[in-house]
Amino acid sequence: MKATILFLFTLLFACHTQAQNIRGQVTDSLTHEPLVGATVTLHRGMETSFLDYAITDTEGRFTFKRSETKGLNINVTYLGYRKKTVPAIGGKQMLVELLPDAITLKEVTIKSGRISLRQDTIKYDLARFASSKDSNVKDILKKLPGIDVDENSGEISYQGKAISHFYVEGMDVTGGSYNQVNENLKADAVESAEIIEHHQPIRSLRNKVPTENIALNLTLKPEARSKWIWNTQAGIGYGDESIYNARLNAIQLAKSKQGLYTYKADHSGKDLTSELQQLTSNDVHQPDDVPSLVNTPTFSMPLDKQRLLDNDTHLLSLNRIYRKDEIKQNRFSFRYLHDEQRRTQGSEETYHYLSDTIHTLDNQDHRVRTELLRVDWDYERNGEESFTRNVLTFQGKRANVLSQMSGDFNLTQRIRTDKIEAENRFNTLYNKENHTWGIRSFLHYTYLPSSLKFGNVSQDIDLHQAYTDNQFYYLRKRNGFGIELTSGINGRLTYLHQGANYQAHRLQLYARPNISLEKNEFRMGFIPNVIWERHPQQGEGKVYFSPLLYIRHRLSSRWSIQASASLQHHSENPEAYYPTPYYRDYRTLVRMKQEIENIQSQSYALYTEYKRPVKEFFWTLALNHFNTQQNFLTHTDYQGKEFVLTSLEHPNRTENYQVRSILSKGFYNWNLKASLEAIYHYGKGLQAGQGIVQLYEMHWTSLKPKVDWTPTHWLSASYQAEISCNRTSSLPVLCDIQQRLSFNIGNDTWNMSLRGEHYQNEISPKQHKNTWLADIGFQYNTGKWRWSANLNNLFNQKEYRYTTYSDVRSYTSWMKMRPREVMVSVQYQW
């Protein structure tokens, strides 16, 4: 009996000893805020060599797995703080507080600089970049060296790469639609911005599976945390008609729960749909593209959308996220959009075929009405031993387009598309010592009925598509050598009905092993993808081999390089072999082959970057080559003012080369940021039209300089330009110049803004068009009130026109602009 009791006691003690994990949090001793990216090393006694190390996460937390803690010390270092050593304590949460201090980095003493670097985290002190003229977070982010914000979409990129995650206090309240934060969160509420390179959002995969993800995390000022911030705004004005806008939003951003609720209405040209765009994608599952057989009219112009958009938009967005503890969180979002647009536009196109030259003329007056509803529920359990996430999404969208056409055609076109989507993403992983395994499952269903009517044509197409991908994941990593295997089965059921039923189903079995070697800052890997594919209705089956080789090497904390080469095989999407003739729009008839083609593509990439964040210097260079080989071309035949697209069997190889470099530099003493992006692109391939197959070549060059300067507290200025030139083998060089210059003058009480734009577009080698635009704004602040008045399009420009090239085609597009408009508005925050 005594022996049994002694055995059980010993077993219990052993289990307790194994559970003595060392956990803790690193914070600032003055502000008590967590320090992200601090280096924590585990030592035995006072030995200089360490047993293990960790980097603190977005909550400042770290964990070591140790069965014995006696005699162990923890050493914590962080840029700008004094180093600290404390005894390791197992079984309970440790708190390590660091004291701010001046530091020395490679013989350079830095004290309270604007940018600091620690491991893979770059921290921007936004107080050193902000001014009273910044109205929201987006305005500050534009000023940060190394970071760029797209003027129209709002997409944020770092060193030329789009960010993959956007956090506020370590949480993603919008599920990737971060424009809602950037447009609605006040600039003075944010304390710092952190760029986290090689970000691994799954804790159980950290230090196991490196990534190229880039995350942006915003840290709020203490007085802005937790409390509700309410903001309301209303404006009225007049141009050719009465215009208005209105906004009401409430924001609460804490560490355990966050909420963002917004209602907006606009009839002044502002594109509210950009706030619904999901700009981050961090899931391994991507469904097959849904065949889209009818073209809904769109537009793309170098101008800001607000100068072109004639809209009546209402947006309601509700976002809420709860963090139950360190690892569990729930997120819910609801979004509704009602958008009506009127667009008056046109184009003159010329097709330069060897056998014929074709000219077309289109004038279009569109009325576009869109209704969208989206609901998301996201549950996540993100622990160090296991990970589980489930995302459920429902979205419904209805679009109705009424178009009046003139030019080559005089007719009315009506398009209606309804799209209903349901999706579920599930991912679970488990860790045990050197092993990781898990299951991923993805389900997606789409129902897409569409209707196209013009003249004597009445076309209705119904589409149902169900897609699933289910995979098993296993990883073993030891001594720098890793074997990662992803294998599974995916299937697609596609039903098309256009008078008769057509099926385009597909089944795949795949294995994707990843054999990697990692030593210090060097990593290389080989991924020999193998896919078996079957199309049952078409009676075709094939085996694809698509290998990928990659190398990544960090030469130093400043310099890194990576290269990759891949060979891919894949089959076409269903619209490429859908046999029933159909109209895409009023002048494009499609008659494709029934054979499924195998497409082979090769890609090669070389990327290098150099950065000195303390010196506010960032530079990248990217070289890319991509080529595609296939046995069919799309042949264009111009018949009776209609374009008829058919499949032509002819070997074709398309090649593309691109060089892209971005240089960004901040000047602390001048409070200035300057950047330059340079791109050269070359492409060649075959184009089939009017019974002839001909070779085309394209050259495109672009230079984009940008400057943001705040010389004093009462003056800020910005300048950006783009100089682009393009030519083809059959067409001469055309160059366009875009320039924007803006000034903000004032103080905390009042502010005046001046903005000028110049567009010089070559319409033809002998004709160019200059467009001058100007805006004036005035703002007065008193307490919680903000009054503003704006005069837009001062010179009352009516139309914008430009020309560009594509393969053997040149096209000149024009679009009606918003007229001269004046607007006054008032804003109140509490």
Model segments located where?
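Membrane-proximal, glycine/serine-rich, low-complexity loop/turn segments characteristic
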Residues: Q20, Q25, S29-H32, E59-R61, ...
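Short, ordered, surface-exposed loop/turn motifs in non-cytosolic proteins
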Residues: L30-R44
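Short Pro-Gly-centered beta-turn/loop motif in secreted/extracellular proteins
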Residues: L35-V36, T63-G71, A88
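A short, solvent-exposed loop/turn motif at the edges and junctions
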Residues: R44-S49, G71-V86
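Short, acidic Ser/Thr/Gly-rich low-complexity loop/linker segments typical of extracellular
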Residues: M46-R61
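Outer-membrane beta-barrel translocator domains and adjoining extracellular loop/strand segments
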Residues: R206-K208, L272-Q278, R342-H359, L392, ...
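Face-selective signature of the C-terminal outer-membrane beta-barrel domain
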Residues: I321-D339, R367-Q538, K542-P547, R554, ...
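Conserved C-terminal beta-signal and adjacent last beta-strands/turns
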Residues: S702-W830
